Amino acid sequence: MVHSQTPNPSTLPAESSLVYAEPQLTEELLERFDSFAQKVARHDGVSAFSEQTRIELSKALRESTLTPPRFFVAEDNGTLAAVFVALTPANDEDTGVIEAAVAPEYRGRGAGSAFFDHAVRQLGEDAVRYRLWVHGSATDTGIESPAHAFATLHGFEPVRVLYKMVLPLDAQTREELVERSDARTLPENLRMRTFTGADEFPWLRVNAAAFAHHPEQGKLTLADLRERTGSPWFRPEGFFIASEMEDNSAIAAFTWTKIPTGQEQGELSPSGEIYVVGVNPQAQGGGLGRTLTLRALAYLACAEDENGEPLRAIDLYVDADNTTAYSLYTSLGFGVATVDRMYAPAQQDAPAA
């Protein structure tokens, strides 16, 4: 839910009647959603919608999902004033995810609150099965933030904290990352290589095992994987796999990097991301995660964006309660930049999604 910076009331549009709808998803509507999401991200400095939400909308458009998301809009004479997306639970034991945003020029007048109430009511009794993501708080306090106040006002309470950690890159840091990677070796029975199309199913199996208890990553499907590998940002040379010497399908660990396209130049931009690090449960405890993480960091330290600009920072996301990973990343020089929080309906004991 977008939460930062309330516009000056004098800049708000004249009072108008917003029309709520749950429209049929079309290519044109998805393009309008993308433009809306980009406008919100430019204003707030953080995206209100996750990559998975965009992927689920794309899958629904192609009718390649059995659980299409619910998509609600508030429109003002053809302009998207607010959007509410509910990713549908995959089964009776699963929970869904809500992400929503209000256009900057429509904030501060209760439009978002009224629309949010309307959309939640449309979910009916299933509303208690959903979790609300709030992205990009500047610190881990959150208690005074407008987003926290909004969530609690609507009967939600925080249940999960996700850190975005950032490592600025300079000449010394780049050199140190390469040296650290070069100093690591794999066991004699393993080799380092990069992803190919033949790795799809072996990777999905290992990913599911490595993230069996992870709310999002462990649920990735073949369609989800292909959405990502078919994206403009995908670079197979940045997807590292440690597999058995004699059997490529026997994957012991992997690290996937991401360099988003279309980034603006800034102090910490363009940046690359440690997208995901996974270790086969049967291979855990041998330091493979650290070895592959360092290989990915060394790659990003020397990488460029699509325009040939060297990366100026590396970022990643880690759950606050994953103290092992957090300690690893802080030891490598990462610091917490922003905090995402997941909220659940108050008094609900179901697991977070």
Functional labels for PLM-detected ranges:
Residues 1-14, 91-92, 104-188, 343-345:
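Acyl-donor-binding surface of acyltransferase catalytic domains
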Residues 2-60, 179-218:
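Short amphipathic alpha-helix that is part of the acyltransferase structural core
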Residues 2-4, 148-176, 294-298, 307-353:
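Active-site/acyl-donor-binding loops of N-acyltransferases
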Residues 22-24, 30, 34-140, 251-271:
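Conserved donor-binding loop and adjoining core beta-sheet/short helix segment
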Residues 102, 277-279, 318:
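Hydrophobic adenine-recognition pocket in adenosine-nucleotide-binding enzymes
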Residues 108-122, 276-279, 285-302, 326-331:
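Conserved acetyl-CoA-binding loop-helix of GNAT-fold acetyltransferases
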Residues 203, 250-255, 263-271, 283-287, ...:
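Extended hydrophobic-aromatic, low-complexity segments
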Residues 208-260:
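Phosphate-binding active sites in nucleotide-utilizing proteins
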